[in-house]
Amino acid sequence: MKVKKGGGGTGSGAEPVPGASNRSAEPTREPGAEAESGSESEPEPGPGPRLGPLQGKQPIGPEDVLGLQRITGDYLCSPEENIYKIDFVRFKIRDMDSGTVLFEIKKPPVSERLPINRRDLDPNAGRFVRYQFTPAFLRLRQVGATVEFTVGDKPVNNFRMIERHYFRNQLLKSFDFHFGFCIPSSKNTCEHIYDFPPLSEELISEMIRHPYETQSDSFYFVDDRLVMHNKADYSYSGTP
């Protein structure tokens, strides 16, 4: 797949935030996943879900999430709705100017993964990740996010990701990436490019002082129907 640049609108009254979910696709850690660089920690339990305007709506399309003005309080689809068996197995973030790898995580081969007791498994496990970056991350101009993913035995048409970033529930930036068509039973690699304008010193200071109040929703669509929803939050203080 070709290298693609992020697009989409910005929230009013704020600069875009350089926090690529990490997940441009899905930088989640499954049981036994191996982090190679960067820092990721287990999230603390948060408040209960807040029911939003899309809660219970079916199907959910791109235009629905593009209208959201705050982080969602809960997941807008269940893991079972990923009928295409899309599985993100590797994720890497790098500074495009220096080539420095800022974060990388990958799943081990299926044969090396630890057995899982399905009865004890959280149904939302692997859908949330917490990132810890240094303040220098907020001054980067361009970041590349490489994702490697596999698909099941169904063709994936018009695969698209919309990723929306918020600071204190104010929309900062919306990215819109099109993966296109994926053939059945294939492994795919794609690098998305996130362009960041300079941030004001005031905003940088606020984001450093308030870790994990920068959050993102990553929505994945096939044929304009939501099939996956992941979440992330970010600290730029350089400490857990």
From Swiss-Prot:
GO cellular component labels: centrosome; cytoplasm; intercellular bridge; spindle midzone; spindle pole
Region (Disordered): 1-62
Binding site for tetradecanoate: Y131
PTM section of the record: Phosphorylation suppresses its interaction with KLHL18 and down-regulates its KLHL18-mediated degradation. Phosphorylated more under light conditions than dark conditions. Dephosphorylated by calcineurin.
Residue numbers bearing the Phosphoserine modification: S37, S39, S41
UniProt-listed GO biological process terms: endocytosis; lipoprotein transport; mitotic cytokinesis; negative regulation of caveolin-mediated endocytosis; negative regulation of clathrin-dependent endocytosis; visual perception
Main location: cytoplasm
Tissue: Localized in photoreceptor synapses in the outer plexiform layer of the retina.
Gene disruption phenotype: Mice develop a slowly progressive retinal degeneration, characterized by mottling in the fundus, mild thinning of the photoreceptor layer, and increase in apoptosis as early as 6 months, dramatic acceleration at approximately 17 months, and virtual obliteration of the photoreceptors by 20 months. Phenotypes are due to defects in protein trafficking, such as Gnat1 mislocalization.
Cell membrane recorded as keyword: no
Subcellular location: Cytoplasm, Cytoskeleton, Microtubule organizing center, Centrosome; Cytoplasm, Cytoskeleton, Spindle; Cytoplasm, Cytoskeleton, Spindle pole
GO molecular function: lipid binding
Keywords tagged on the record: Cone-rod dystrophy, Cytoplasm, Cytoskeleton, Endocytosis, Lipid-binding, Phosphoprotein, Protein transport, Sensory transduction, Transport, Vision
Biased composition (Gly residues): 1-12
Pfam families tied to this protein: GMP_PDE_delta
Keyword set includes Transferase: no
Assembly with partners or alone: May interact with GTP-bound ARL1. Interacts with ARL2 and ARL3 (GTP-bound forms); this promotes the release of myristoylated cargo proteins. Found in a complex with ARL3, RP2 and UNC119; RP2 induces hydrolysis of GTP ARL3 in the complex, leading to the release of UNC119. Interacts with NPHP3 (when myristoylated). Interacts with CYS1 (when myristoylated). Interacts with MACIR; interaction only takes place when UNC119 is not liganded with myristoylated proteins. Interacts with CABP4; in the absence of calcium. Interacts with DNM1; leading to a decrease of DNM1 GTPase activity.
Function: Involved in synaptic functions in photoreceptor cells, the signal transduction in immune cells as a Src family kinase activator, endosome recycling, the uptake of bacteria and endocytosis, protein trafficking in sensory neurons and as lipid-binding chaperone with specificity for a diverse subset of myristoylated proteins. Specifically binds the myristoyl moiety of a subset of N-terminally myristoylated proteins and is required for their localization. Binds myristoylated GNAT1 and is required for G-protein localization and trafficking in sensory neurons.
Domain description: Adopts an immunoglobulin-like beta-sandwich fold forming a hydrophobic cavity that captures N-terminally myristoylated target peptides. Phe residues within the hydrophobic beta sandwich are required for myristate binding.
Family: Belongs to the PDE6D/unc-119 family.
Name this protein carries in UniProt: Protein unc-119 homolog A
Gene expressing this chain: Unc119
